[in-house]
From Swiss-Prot:
UniProt-listed InterPro entries: DNA-dir_RpoC_beta_prime (IPR045867), DNA-dir_RpoC_beta_prime_bact (IPR012754), RNA_pol_asu (IPR000722), RNA_pol_N (IPR006592), RNA_pol_Rpb1_1 (IPR007080), RNA_pol_Rpb1_3 (IPR007066), RNA_pol_Rpb1_3_sf (IPR042102), RNA_pol_Rpb1_4 (IPR007083)
Residue numbers binding Mg(2+): D535, D537, D539
Protein name per UniProt: DNA-directed RNA polymerase subunit beta'
Cofactor(s) required for function per UniProt: Mg(2+); Zn(2+)
Gene (name only): rpoC
Keyword Nuclease carried by entry: no
Amino acid sequence: MLDVNFFDELRIGLATADDIRQWSYGEVKKPETINYRTLKPEKDGLFCEKIFGPTRDWECYCGKYKRVRFKGIICERCGVEVTRAKVRRERMGHIELAASVTHIWYFKGVPSRLGYLLDLAPKDLEKIIYFAAYVITSVNTEMRHNEMSTLEAEIGVERKQIADQRDADLEARAQKLEADLAELEQEGAKSDVRRKVKEGGEREMRQLRDRAQRELDKLDEIWETFTKLEPRQLIADELLYRELYDRFGEYFTGGMGAESIQALLQDFDINAEADQLRETIRSGKGQKKLRALKRLKVVAAFQATGNNPSGMVLNCVPVIPPDLRPMVQLDGGRFATSDLNDLYRRVINRNNRLKRLIDLGAPEIIVNNEKRMLQESVDALFDNGRRGRPVTGPGNRPLKSLSDLLKGKQGRFRQNLLGKRVDYSGRSVIVVGPQLKLHQCGLPKEMAVELFKPFVMKRLVDLNHAQNIKSAKRMVERQRPQVWDVLEEVIAEHPVLLNRAPTLHRLGIQAFEPQLVEGKAIQLHPLVCEAFNADFDGDQMAVHLPLSAEAQAEARILMLSSNNILSPASGRPLAMPRLDMVTGLYHLTRQLDGAKGEGQSFSSVGEAIMAFDRGGLDLQAKVKIRVRDLVPNAEQRPEDWEPGQPWLAETTLGRVWFNELLPEDYPFVNDLLPKKRQAAIVNDLAERYPMVTVAQTLDKLKDAGFHWATRSGVTVSISDVVVPPNKTEILDGYEAKADQVEKRYRRGALSYQERNAELVKVWTAAKDEVAEAMEANFPEDNSISMIVKSGAAGNMTQVVQLAGMRGLVSNPKGEYIPRPIKANFREGLSVLEYFISNHGARKGLADTALRTADSGYLTRRLVDVSQDVIVRETDCGTERGIRMPIAEKLPDGKLLRDAHVETSVYARTTAEDVTDSDGNVVLARGSDLGDPAIEKLLAAGVTKVKVRSVLTCESGVGVCAVCYGRSMATGKLVDVGEAVGIVAAQSIGEPGTQLTMRTFHQGGVAGDDITTGLPRVQELFEARVPKGKAPIADAPGRIRMEDNDRYWKITIIPDDGSEEIVYDKLSKRQRLAAISVDGTERQITDGDHVDVGQQLLEGAVDPHEVLRVMGPREAQLHLVREVQEVYRSQGVGIHDKHVEVIVRQMLRRVIIIDSGATEFLPGSPVERSQFEGENRRVVAEGGDPASGRPVLMGITKASLATESWLSAASFQETTRILTNAAIEGASDKLVGLKENVIIGKLIPAGTGINRYRNIQVQPTEEARAAAYAIPSYDDGYYTPDVFGTGTGAAVPLDDYDFGRDYR
């Protein structure tokens, strides 16, 4: 087999019949599979050993040769080669067809490639292929032209003969009629008898005339058809074709079925056709030009690749290896077989029957029918169900054809190539492990011994506990005591990977050092739950074991949980104290007035602790303590304080204890710490300290949090839910107000909608008042309020539902039900209240289920479009960048920090020197914008910064590190080789489930829903035209408005005096857009001035319009802004750079308008880098460059338009992409991740990128000298510890045997 790491591209093309015969090891002639008595394959059948190889290793069919020593011999009795049985997975056979058949992919795909090539409509093509019409394949025009007069004369003679015959017959009939009438007259017959005879005679004469006329018409038609006969002409009338053939057979050839298509293809002149089409495109207009463009795509593909078009018609069909379509015996003697075997059997049966019919010389009609059936059976084999009804197996199930094996989630690509199962894994339920360090996990002993079995066995043999591997295995299985000691030793420092499904982002798999635990549950560190989105209500996790040294190193350095504290999406810590820990730290840092020991002073922390232990001092009492090891913050710092000096802190003992958890030089924190403050401190630590310190501090915070949460006595009981005593009075007051509204409604003073709106107002106010009363009524030390105030769990609205009132609930449409639920959960709901509150809640659950599926599909498309965005170089050297605001100057001269600095400017690189108002450089070009740098800029009064962005990056492939900026997950400049595209896709997809599905009814837009949440994100990324789109101004100018009863009409009079731009029929259901004039907002009116790209109506703007009017940069920024809007509204912080990576992929292509001297086809999408490169080449050679316009592609379309056919085929529309790729002879350069995963190469990202793979070790001078010293070892084999102990000389690397070839 070819080693996968040694090829750089993969090409796909059309196979000709010769190729198929070359691959084949023999022809399959019989439909038999295996002999049901002997269970051995039948000779010449679908499982034949002679063709495909032996079923048992080194054994021929008849048993003459058995054993490996006969390797390679072909048995003279049965003809089977003696070799390994696994060749049955790679050897192919073939079926020689008795008649050609077309390949259904090329004839039936949309658009039909065969139809485009031959310029035949798919309908006509189908008629020809399935024997419903004849097609003319060639016409000898010269011979026809030369002999035209002779032929015409012959036809003339024939016409005359028919006319003469007709006249003679009519004459005879007329005479007979006269004689009959005369005879009747003599006999004196009645008049009606005479009339009848006369009418009968006339009728017969009419028939004679008609018959002759029909014959003449037929002659005319035949002659007419013959004179105009052209190749590729269809003749549906069989009689007409027969007549033509009988009369003029030597002047043309024709036929039906795939053979005639093959004849057409063989005579087809690709170059001439291509030139003609190019001419049509140059000179043509409208439909003609469009059709020529589409045809040229197919024709040019054949021209460029030199593929032979007759490969689209098959004379033989390949048979895939039998072990890929196995047949297995079930209990009870029945067989289960792959559907392919049934499909192949139908082909072989029909083919054999056709051969027999042809040999017997059967009539044409019967043979044609059999040929049609053969065509249909080959169609079903390739793509069952593409044409007509699918072939079904038992139970009416459509059989799975070759195409179905590749398609969809269960197809080869997605099931087996992109997602493989791994050995060395286990799974179990998780429980919390509060005693673990951040980088540890608890692994159940039994699971560990199974996972590490080979390691344990080897070590048992090394330590002479066992004689050989077999006895070591027995020891492990019997769980002898020595096994546990060895296991401890083996797992030390050997990380394992833990994964929790669904793995929505890269933190869903992290590495830990295992600690052996009793029981059967995996223990997980509480701080990594957030990243895994895990809880301990029965979640399960999988364990995987990295085996090779490289894998272990990567797991330890890149994936260890203590190195993954920051979120790759926002760059902020994910490992935060949560739940109990928050409560504990909150309790620890509270300060209570009047607590025991308040106002005392202590000479040292130790003294205070002693007082606390004796019960003389409360944890939360305000005291003064002399501290030595802590650093005072700005407020507490004495005038002349030097580091290391003691100072007097006015604080509580709890806060001193808290500060002892933080790094030594961290300024003293003297505040109450709810969750937000704790998060800010962890954030600050992550910005200022190395990861190791942060991890250690987090562990200390976790331990302290649990310790003090236990001692805080926070518990929840029903008596903690205190209902405010004045609740009924409050509600009675509002009940009266509601009655007033009802009265006004009954009197007709309010409409139904107004009444509802009024009631909603009344009851919302009631709920707020009850909530205030409830908060005021809660005791200071109430557990529930403590949990909420500390930010550990829950929020005030939930407490209001528990202790205040449930309030208004909405129905599934999202409208409020105007009757409130007055009860709370403490008092209990009535049946009606319970029912209406359930109504909306159930909708919420159904919504979540739908959202999960939608969000998963969005992530998949995002990954697909961005998978080949990898950091390929450190700096692309571009001067371009994007200006971003970091602050706004207020009228009083103060700076107001921009709300979105966190997600826009933070973690980027400056694109130019940043100067203050005096021109002093505050930050040099290329500086990293972390929190300290941004603080510095704000202090210097800077409001806008020009930053590097992936949108302006000029790297040809992927992006460069400086344009991307800081990697959010490490806090440093991103490494070359980082797969930033996939990180971006995960960061956007992972919070997808949190986005709402609902479309909100917004006031003012009657009946029009404004799309928000997940559907809006999809609409943006797919670049769809939004529902109710808002027009934008094409040019700056004044506007003139006209107002009809149903529509607005807006006209823009451009400033530059060009012609007016009219926007007609703008629906009045959309309000006019707001503009701000002199700081006040109002709607646009007649005579206002608008800028280019300004919205004229409210609603969403069409991104394609933005691209057309404002250009690509604005379109990109617009998409980033709009996507961020949705995520921010849900409180999700994702950095802009992730959205930018995706948007960059959407605008990578240019549509060719005019191809100039290049090879591009007009109307085809081309990668921008390719377009620019080709233009440079053409201009250098003195030709005209191509012109094109940027085009915005949705992510699905962009994925399918990727250069890599492997990646596109494994995404969607597999057959269409493979069809196209084969015609174009597409070659996959294997640059993205997916292509390499599919063929099993290391991915070109991270440690697999070329510049890391091609590193060579250069020995130092000393090592070189030592290499030739006399070695001090006896045997030729060195144990690995030789290297560590310094015995002997350095080992020459060239001689050292690593067990496999690393070079």
